[in-house]
C-alpha cells in the first residue's frame, strides 16, 4: 500500500459522511437532504468512532478523523495488529494526538491530501481536527466532523453540529492554531507498512 492509496481511501471514507447533521448533540446524526433517517450510516459512524475510544456526548472531530483512517485501513486489508498500532497513537483528543505524533517525529508541518489536521484553541487543551482533501497556497480544503457551516464564533468553528467541507488557512484562524498534520506517510510508518 502506498501513501497515495491510503490518502485516497481516507478521503473516500470521510466523503461518505458529509451532510450528516447532529440531531442529538455529539451523539446522533441525520442527513436532512435524504429521505428517512440514515440509521445504517450513523451506526457505522458511531462504531468507527467508538474504537477511539469516543463516547456519545463527547466532541468528535478527532474521533471522526481517526475513524476514517480506521475505515480506510480496513478497506486496504491491513492486519488487526497494524490497526492496534494506529489506535495506540491517535486519540479522540487533538492536543494529545499531536503530542503523541510529535514525540515520534511523525507530526508534519506540511499538509498533503489525506492528512489529519490538528489544531489547538488558544492556549487551552481544546482542539479541533479535520481531514485535508486539497492544499492550495496558504489554504486547505477539509472534511470535518463537529464543525459549523457558518461559524459565528471560535467556539462554533471548532465545535458545531455538522460533518461537512471547510476551507481553512493552513496556519489556522482566529484562536484556532495549527499544531501539525498526520500525513498518510506517517500513518504507514506507525502501522509498520
Feature annotation, model-predicted:
Residues 6, 75-153:
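...with weaker cross-activation on analogous glycine-rich loops/strands in unrelated enzymes
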Residues 4, 123-193:
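Aromatic- and glycine-rich peptidoglycan recognition patches
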Residues 41-48, 95-115, 163-190:
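Extended, compositionally biased low-complexity polar/Lys-Gly-rich tracts
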Amino acid at each position: 500500500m502506498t501513501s497515495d492509496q491510503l490518502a485516497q481511501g481516507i478521503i473516500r471514507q470521510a466523503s461518505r459522511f458529509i451532510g450528516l447533521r447532529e440531531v442529538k448533540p455529539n451523539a446522533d446524526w441525520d442527513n436532512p437532504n435524504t429521505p428517512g433517517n440514515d440509521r445504517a450510516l450513523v451506526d457505522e459512524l458511531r462504531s468507527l468512532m467508538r474504537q477511539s475510544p469516543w463516547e456519545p456526548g463527547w466532541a468528535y472531530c478527532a474521533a471522526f478523523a481517526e475513524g476514517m483512517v480506521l475505515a480506510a485501513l480496513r478497506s486496504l486489508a491491513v492486519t488487526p495488529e497494524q490497526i492496534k498500532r494506529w489506535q495506540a497513537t491517535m486519540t479522540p483528543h487533538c492536543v494529545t494526538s499531536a503530542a503523541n505524533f510529535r514525540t515520534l517525529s511523525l507530526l508534519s508541518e506540511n499538509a498533503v491530501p489525506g492528512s489529519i489536521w490538528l489544531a489547538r484553541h488558544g492556549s487551552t487543551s481544546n482542539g479541533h481536527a479535520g481531514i485535508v482533501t486539497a492544499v492550495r497556497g496558504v489554504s486547505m480544503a477539509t472534511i470535518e466532523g463537529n464543525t459549523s457551516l457558518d461559524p459565528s464564533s471560535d467556539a462554533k468553528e471548532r465545535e458545531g453540529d455538522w460533518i461537512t467541507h471547510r476551507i481553512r488557512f493552513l496556519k489556522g484562524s482566529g484562536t484556532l492554531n495549527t499544531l501539525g498534520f498526520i500525513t498518510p506517510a506517517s500513518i504507514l510508518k506507525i502501522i509498520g507498512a
